[in-house]
Amino acid sequence: MKVKVLLFASLREVVGSSQSAVELEPGASVEDVWTRMISLYPRLAPHTGTIAFALNSAFTNPHEALHDGDEVAFLPPVSGG
C-alpha cells in the first residue's frame, strides 16, 4: 500500500521536502512509516521519541493501522515565546 507522508519544520529540513510517499505492506502502522523514513533518511533518527503523529489530519498513536492512500504527518515539538 502507498502512504503519503507530511513533514514539518526540522523534519522537512532533514528530508529536503515537505512531502514524501512510502510503500508498505498491508497492516503496517504509523510507527512502520517512521521506521521506513529513518531507513531512507537516517538523520531523522534523533527525532524518535519527540515527534507527534497524525493520521488523516487527526493526532494518533504510533500503533494505529494504516490503509492505502492514508496521509501520515510527523510533527516535531513546537517551541517559541
Spans of model-derived segments:
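Ubiquitin-like/PB1-type beta-grasp interaction modules and other compact soluble beta-rich domains
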Residues: M1-G80
